[in-house]
A protein has these predicted regions:
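Extracytoplasmic
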Residues: 199-205, 210, 359-367, 383-386, ...
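Membrane-embedded helix bundles of polyisoprenyl
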Residues: 56-69, 73-160, 168-187, 193-194, ...
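C-terminal substrate/ligand-recognition segments
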Residues: 46, 50-53, 244-257, 261-286, ...
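Periplasmic/ER-lumenal interhelical loops and adjacent helix-loop junctions
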Residues: 1-11, 173, 178-258, 280, ...
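Contiguous transmembrane helix-bundle modules in multi-pass membrane proteins
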Residues: 96-103, 115-118, 123-133, 143, ...
Length: 696
């Protein structure tokens, strides 16, 4: 946000992982226009408004889509209310980067329908291109992939039904890719450096926290009105579906009714397939269906949390709930009501006797009562009111469950990161003199305490640089994961750096990689964790701050260097004393005396622009603690020089004896060409949308 306020594109994030791509982290949505709201209202309020706006867009978009597909005003309204009340949607509101793509799904399907069915003109093509671009820019790549997948199935149904529109769809797709080109290229560029470039393994994808657990499947899908922690009840935070028993039953009625209708089958079949596939894929890599998708669908293997497919399952189900409300009179048929009752009894038996549980007898009893209520409604209500009453039951059940939804459980009196603890406040002051920080503080607890304890990435709130960080995507680079072996023989590469540290911490290696400050929670004994560190520099009732005596500096001149060797990080861990004065880069520097590296003055003007002042009495390798990747350009005294990769991760340049001003600037070569293409495509799309038709 600070970069945007200065009219700069934040290509890099200087505060985590020793500087990593920021624009290339698709989930951040740097180029997503609604993010500008945060510039006007501040980060906390601004992102709250963004979430509210997207919830409105999701609900109203669902109403519009339902009406376009032939639902009644009642069915459309119920679908719109249900889609914002279900647990999978409510949970995503605390992750703005995930609710944003989901909010576009109904509008994207609506725009696809308009583009294919338009009789003439190109206005609908331009509208679809703009909506598709909004989707591509909107946030988390896994959710974008899910939305695009649903849209692809829906498009197949459209083509089969209307047998036209391929050219129009192709033009819209081309324009949307062109408009999103700067972001797409940044994402691909970042992915090429990421440790997950080859995709995630089945072992990673089988993590119980990231899949729908069979035993708790009913709990995750039906939810409960008994209160308690939704994440614990569902098996995991990401597994919260909470569609409600009434919602699932009425949605099932809607699926059957839509599939039976020849006029609705073209769209109901793809969306029913979305629900089936989404549920199967949410179970993780335990079925052939998942394996096939893992092998064949581009990007499918990059999604860490399989259970996130429940989000699009919920959106599709909400639409079918609207259909079910419209088709509620079918329950007046004894044959249909008996079939439904039999299905409910079968599910109850599976939950009661099988591997799937209800969590508690009370929850199971409430599920049965709710199902019975759905069956009773057609008997006691007037035929013309059956749909309204069923819709009311669904909405009330979801509304009651939403009282204990995740957003209502993590509310705080003040904005996250609004205040720092006394120790962290002092650290913010002394850290202005340089050095990065690592925090050995709790990984669980109240959200405001996690932020004050500098949980990885939270240090950004306080303008504190760190070699540590947390991300499930492209910001975990290959050089960074390889560097972890300098601190541990068996590092946890999917977790923050601090998870690979044991007592006592490797002070010399941390100092070499720029770590000057250590924050300890008071449950850790300093004599055990940082026995050779100076301090405490600051302390309070929760934390203490310590200074590393082996810190080399943010920028350093090395006088001894040799080419990199295999297993470099292991050498730095096990044989550090023999290489403490030697840097590893594609350069040979011999030194016989006074070989210890020298700290240099450096200024970070922006994340993408650094200036280093060096005065050396012999040839040296000047290094700064910033990750080296494509896009960096270096000059020495105004003349371009080659940038070198040092110690497998940082950027450096070779200089001769003398005084030097070294400048490092980052901007990828593809940026301006991509911007020109994007602006041109936007102009074309806008002309399509707003041009006036000339009639004779």
């Amino acid at each position: 946000m600070a970069a945007l306020r200065q009219w700069r594109i934040p290509f890099l994030n200087e505060f985590i992982f020793g500087t990593v791509p920021h624009l290339g982290n698709h989930a951040v949505g740097v180029l997503y226009p609604p993010r500008l709201i945060a510039l006007l209202f501040g980060s906390s309020l601004g992102h709250g408004l963004i979430v509210v706006g997207h919830m409105l867009m999701l609900g109203l978009g669902m109403v519009a889509l339902a009406r376009r597909l032939g639902l009644s005003s009642l069915g459309g309204a119920i679908a719109g209310v249900v889609v914002v009340l279900i647990g999978s949607t409510q949970t995503k509101t605390v992750q703005f980067e995930q609710i944003q793509p989901l909010a576009w799904l109904p509008l994207l399907l609506l725009a696809l329908h308009g583009c294919v069915t338009a009789r003439r003109g190109w206005r609908e093509v331009g509208v679809l291109a703009i909506v598709a671009t909004g989707t591509l820019l909107s946030g988390h790549p896994q959710l974008i992939l899910e939305v695009v997948f649903v849209a692809a199935l829906f498009t197949i149904g459209l083509i089969v039904r209307y047998r036209t529109g391929l050219v129009r769809l192709g033009v819209a797709a081309g324009l949307s890719v062109a408009m999103a080109l700067p972001q797409l290229l940044a994402t691909l560029d970042a992915r090429s450096m990421a440790s997950l470039d080859e995709g995630r393994s089945f072992t990673d994808l089988s993590n119980g926290m990231y899949i729908l657990q069979v035993r708790k499947a009913a709990q995750a899908l039906f939810g409960t009105i008994t209160g308690g922690d939704p994440a614990a009840f569902s098996g995991a935070f990401e597994a919260i579906g909470w569609f409600g028993v009434a919602g699932v039953i009425v949605g099932a009625i809607g699926i059957v009714a839509a599939l039976k209708s020849s006029s609705d089958r073209w769209w109901s079949l793809p969306l029913a397939a979305t629900i089936i596939l989404g549920l199967i894929w949410s179970l993780g890599p335990r079925t052939p269906v998942f394996t096939i998708a893992y092998r064949l669908i581009p990007g499918f293997d990059l999604g860490r949390v399989s259970v996130r497919w429940l989000a699009v399952v919920g959106i599709a189900l909400a639409l079918f709930v609207g259909v079910g409300v419209d088709a509620a009179r079918s329950l007046l048929s004894r044959r249909i009501s008996r079939t439904l009752a039999s299905a409910i009894v079968l599910v109850a038996i599976v939950i009661g006797l099988g591997p799937i549980t209800s969590g508690s007898r009370l929850a199971g009893a409430i599920w049965l009562l709710t199902a019975a209520l759905v069956l009773i409604v057609p008997v006691v209500a007037q035929p013309r009111h059956v749909g309204r009453v069923l819709g009311f039951v669904v909405v009330v059940e979801l509304a009651v469950m939403s009282v204990s939804a995740i957003p209502n459980r993590i509310t705080m009196d003040s904005a996250v990161g609004e205040t720092a603890s006394p120790a962290i406040s002092e650290l913010m002051s002394v850290a202005k003199s340089g050095g990065s920080v690592i925090a050995l503080t709790p990984d669980a607890g109240p959200h405001d305490e996690l932020v004050r304890g500098l949980r990885p990435n939270a240090n950004t709130w306080f303008d504190l640089h760190s070699l540590d960080g947390y991300d499930g995507g492209v910001q975990v680079t290959q050089p960074w994961t390889e560097m972890l072996r300098a601190f541990s023989a068996d590092p946890a590469i999917d977790l923050p750096l601090r998870s690979s540290l044991s007592a006592p911490v490797p002070s010399q290696q941390l100092g070499r990689f720029g770590v000057r400050w250590m924050v300890l929670d008071n449950d850790r004994a300093p004599s055990e964790w940082v026995p050779d560190w100076n301090g405490p520099i600051a302390e309070d009732a929760r934390y203490s701050v310590w200074e590393n005596p082996f810190w080399n500096g943010d920028s350093v001149a090395w006088f001894a260097a040799r080419p990199p060797v295999a297993g470099l990080a292991d050498i730095l861990r096990t044989e550090y004393s023999s290489v403490s004065a030697t840097a590893f880069a594609d350069i040979d520097l011999n030194c016989t005396e006074y070989c210890q590296p020298t700290r240099l003055d450096s200024t970070r003007i922006t994340a993408e622009h650094l200036v280093i002042t060096a005065e050396v009495d012999r040839p040296a390798l000047v290094v700064t603690n910033v990750q080296a990747f494509k896009g960096w350009e270096a000059t020495v005294n105004g003349l371009p020089v080659d940038a070198l990769v040092v110690d497998g991760i940082f950027i450096g340049v070779a200089v001769d004896a003398g005084s030097h001003i070294i400048e490092l600037r980052y901007q990828p070569a593809w940026w301006w060409p991509a911007v020109i293409v994007a602006i041109s495509a936007l102009v074309i799309a806008m002309v399509m949308v707003f041009r006036q038709r000339v009639t004779s």
